[in-house]
């Protein structure tokens, strides 16, 4: 061995196979055992081997834990082994004789998987090549909670001849324990990244069972093959059902901006109270309204099924960007849905936003334009419900709310055309990443577009929500456009510089809220 190798092992209650695992590694100069909460004899077993060094850490996901173990290693070449795996003598000899002169090289070898003492060559357990030997200065494990892997982009992968024995499971009880753990991790990892449904879960279960038991020859291995095939299929079913369940839960803060139009705000707030899926809170972002607006908010808050918070600052001119930042900074939700105080919400408004939410995306919604007469009737309580056929609607297609149509026609866009903050949704973490709205904007216009430019440049995709997120825009005369030329200049600068961050943004409000 021209270069010493550090072996890393994750353990938790690993006493059964750990002695054989460590026995096969005695010729390696260092073995890092990273334990995350063993309550059996795992630690005592590890201390019996002079080349082992024990590190303890709570569970943070398999990928992050393996990278942490590598950080504790003395040597740059890392051999990552699981505590239920045993190197064959031939594989150990082969690894110890490698020159390891090229850090761009990574090595993999064949793993034989056992159920009890039986070598299983079916159900996807055969032809199992695992990549485990790498230079930690060149690559690392992907930071995934489950199904972690060594990143190999730009690296050369070399196969070794020796084999690794993997004592996967000894009983059906172990299969079920692992199934529950891994399906939960999968669901949390893919929450709002992948879609799922009960129908999809059932179809995937049926195909997985057929593939494992028939196509991958599980039927040749007796009850063990049947148990493994059903375990794999059930794992597929439950990971997608758990994902479906996770995707139903979104912690939404609804932010409503307002300025001195208490009648419209009252109508919007009442529509928020009637949502089929309620937010965790409603925050009124008030750009300096008079005291009568505060009175309306406080009175309606007593009727609200969720907390209503009033975020206000003095009226020193049109400072929409700043009051939005202040409201987002005080929000407790993970997901922000933002509307103007003249946008009356369809009962499924938040539900359709939740259905369309995806990590690394923001949502641009539309608005249904109402006539002056219809707007007044709605505020006076003369109209109880608006449909696409209600009189006084100027763009009726925008009034259609359908989960099926929304999923089919809500497309990604890469531009800032028709960006409107009056109906928009985004992850709070993404807002922080670009430092929120740019408070250099004073006066009406362009603060939404400049915010979106930075999101797009950060790799946050835009998705236009169609046939969902329906909101009815109450008619009013257009705002004055004083200051638009200066705001246009700020927007053009952000476009030219491909801006991803604004200095004058939300960070100071976040810091203030921490005190």
Identify the role of each PLM range.
Residues 4, 63-70, 88-246, 321, ...:
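Catalytic-site signature of metal-activated, phosphate-bearing donor transferases
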Residues 24, 35-45, 82, 271, ...:
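A conserved acidic beta->alpha catalytic loop
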Residues 9-27, 261-274:
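Short, well-formed alpha-helical segments that are part of the catalytic scaffolds
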Residues 43-72, 294-322, 326, 330:
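Conserved donor nucleotide-binding strand/loop of the catalytic core
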Residues 78, 336:
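Short aromatic/hydrophobic "clamp" motif used to bind/position activated sugar donors
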Residues 77, 84-87, 343-344:
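Acidic metal-phosphate-binding loop of nucleotide-sugar-dependent transferases
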Residues 4-6, 250-253, 281, 450:
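Cell-envelope/extracellular polymer assembly enzymes that use nucleotide-activated donors
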Residues 17-19, 40-48, 90-91, 266, ...:
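Acidic helix N-cap motif at the loop->helix transition within catalytic regions
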């Amino acid at each position: 061995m021209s270069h010493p190798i550090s072996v890393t092992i994750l353990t938790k209650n690993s006493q059964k196979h750990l002695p054989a695992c460590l026995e096969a590694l005695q010729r390696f100069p260092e073995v890092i055992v990273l334990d995350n909460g063993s309550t059996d004899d795992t630690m005592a077993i590890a201390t019996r081997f002079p080349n082992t060094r024990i590190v303890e850490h709570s569970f943070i996901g398999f990928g992050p834990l393996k990278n942490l173990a590598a950080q504790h290693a003395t040597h740059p070449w890392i051999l990552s082994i699981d505590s239920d795996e045993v190197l064959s003598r031939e594989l150990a000899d082969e690894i110890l004789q490698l020159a390891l002169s090229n850090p761009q090289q990574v090595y993999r070898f064949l793993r034989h998987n056992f159920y009890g003492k039986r070598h299983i060559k079916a159900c996807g357990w055969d032809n199992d090549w695992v990549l485990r030997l790498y230079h930690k200065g060149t690559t690392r494990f992907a930071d995934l909670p489950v199904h972690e892997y060594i990143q190999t982009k730009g690296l050369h992968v070399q196969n070794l001849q020796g084999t690794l024995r993997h004592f996967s499971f000894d009983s059906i009880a172990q299969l079920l324990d692992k199934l529950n753990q891994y399906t939960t991790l999968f669901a949390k990892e893919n929450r709002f990244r992948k879609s799922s449904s009960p129908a999809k879960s059932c179809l995937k279960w049926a195909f997985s069972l057929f593939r494992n038991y028939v196509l991958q020859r599980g039927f040749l291995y007796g009850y063990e093959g049947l148990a493994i095939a059903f375990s794999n299929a059930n794992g597929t079913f439950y990971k997608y059902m758990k994902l479906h369940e996770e995707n139903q839960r979104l912690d939404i803060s609804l932010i409503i901006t307002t300025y001195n139009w208490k009648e419209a705000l009252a109508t919007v707030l009442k529509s928020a109270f009637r949502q089929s899926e309620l937010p965790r809170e409603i925050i009124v972002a008030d750009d300096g309204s008079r005291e009568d607006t505060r009175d309306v908010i406080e009175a309606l808050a007593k009727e609200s099924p969720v907390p209503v918070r009033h975020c206000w600052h003095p009226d020193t001119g049109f400072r929409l960007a700043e009051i939005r930042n202040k409201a987002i900074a005080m929000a407790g939700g993970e997901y922000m849905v933002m509307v103007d105080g003249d946008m009356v919400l369809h009962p499924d408004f938040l539900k359709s936003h939740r259905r369309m939410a995806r990590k690394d995306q923001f949502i641009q919604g539309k608005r249904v334009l109402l006539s002056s007469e219809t707007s007044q009737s709605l505020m006076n309580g003369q109209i109880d419900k608006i449909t696409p056929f209600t009189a006084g609607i100027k763009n009726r297609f925008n009034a259609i709310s359908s989960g099926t149509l929304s999923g089919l026609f809500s497309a990604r866009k890469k531009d800032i055309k028709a960006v409107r903050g009056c109906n928009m949704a985004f992850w709070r973490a993404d807002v922080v990443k670009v430092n929120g709205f740019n408070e250099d904007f004073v006066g009406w216009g362009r603060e939404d577009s400049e915010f979106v430019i930075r999101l797009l440049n950060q790799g946050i995709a835009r998705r236009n929500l169609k046939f969902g997120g329906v909101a009815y825009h109450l008619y009013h005369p257009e705002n004055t456009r004083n200051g638009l030329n200066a705001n246009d200049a700020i927007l053009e600068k952000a476009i030219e510089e491909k801006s991803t961050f604004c200095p004058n943004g939300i960070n100071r409000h976040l810091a203030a809220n921490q005190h």
